Every structure is written in structure tokens, then in C-alpha cells.
Amino acid sequence: MNAVLADVLNTRRVVARDGSVIPLHSEISVAEGAALQRLVRELQPQVTLEIGCGYGISALYICEALAEVGGRRHIVIDPDQLTDWKSAGLFTVERAGFASLLEFHDLPSHLALPRLEEAGVKVGLALIDGWHTFDYAMVDFFYVDHLLDVGGVVMLDDTSAYPAIRKLARYIATHRQYIPLRNDSAEQPVADPFVPSPGSIRRLAERVFQPRLVYPDATLGLPPDNFIAFRKIADDKRGNGSGGSRRWDQHHEF
């Protein structure tokens, strides 16, 4: 483990750019950091992305592994990094020796992500850990999907802590060409892609009962953990519903 990362985790303190010392909080778990590093080492992406930087712990995990595999760039989007977080996340990553990998966007994600798409940026791994309401997180996923390579992985943080993020995980599992992964491997899916039952009884149940009762998380391959990674198995295609395309009126209860 990088010495700066180890020190921050051991002391539970981070140093801001102005020299002030701040108690560490709101960081990803060690298990999630280890999962991110496994994904980077297995996927070997050239470019990675995260939405929400905070004190830079997730960026440190990603950059450490990205440097090992010869990656070129880690894109960080965080409109509050220079203010609420006192640049502590960026400064910590720089102190760890990964400044050359960083590309920082001091913009809300709904503004930064379309610019990246317009510039033709593609990423192999993305972490969504920004504003935790369903609308903002959904917009983050929508644009990340446009940037993510087929075979790449998107990870959602706080999937058990915030109902809106769990709901987004259910949307991805039921509507898009993604497979949830086991948290110890980038190569082994938890379940096959979701296919809604065509039966009339099941359709009636979907109307009467909550979707989570009809399709429990476990049947969708969603673990109870506080982070879930999804592998993208195909680009999004709009069409008539055949050949993996989505109809203009596609909807499944989720």
C-alpha cells in the first residue's frame, strides 16, 4: 500500500493544501478500495474516472493500481473539492506521487461529463460517488455509460447506505446491458442478465406488489454490500427491442 494512503488510514487524518490537519471521515471502506484495485489490475484500463473525490482515498486506491498497470489518466470530477474539502483530496493524491495521473474538473458532474463525451473520452473503469439523490446519480450513470468501454466496469458506492443509490443499482440491473460482479473478481458475474418474466401472473404481481418483492435484489444478482460493480456487456442501442436494442418506451418495474 502506498505510504501516504497507509498513513492517512492509520492516523485517520488528512492534510489540506493550506497545511491544516483534518480528521478523516466519509471515505470508502478498505474492502471497497481493495475491490477497486483488483478491478484496475484485472481490466488494465488506460483511463479511469471518479465522480466525487472528498479526501482522495478512492483516488489513491485507483491511482496506485493504475500506475502499476501503466495507465495514463485518472479523471476526477468534484465541484466541492476546492471549497468544502479544502483541496485535501487532490493534495493527498499529489503527496502520494500521482499528480501526473490526475485530471481534475472543478464542475458539477452534469456539466463535466457531457464535455468529456463531446471530447471523445473513453474510460475503462468509473466510480460513481457524487450527489446521492436518484436524479443526480442517474444522470451520472447515463453519461458514464456513454464514456465506458464495452467490457469496462462502473462501481456504485453507498449502495446499502442510501436508498436512491440502491434504486439506481436496480435500474441498471433491470434495464441496461450490465452484469453485477462478485466483489472479489472483475471476471465472475453474480447472475445472468435480467430478463423479465412474460407471464400474466408475474405482470399482475409487478402491478400489485413492490418491485423488490417480485424481483428481490438477490435474484438480480445485487449483493447486500455498500458497493456494487457492474460490467458493461454491450453499448446501449435504441431500436425495436430486438438484437439487444431498447424500445423507445422500454420500462420494467424496478
Regions found by a protein language model. Name each.
Residues 1-35:
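Mobile, glycine- and charge-enriched loop segments
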Residues 23-27, 33-254:
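S-adenosylmethionine/decaboxylated-SAM
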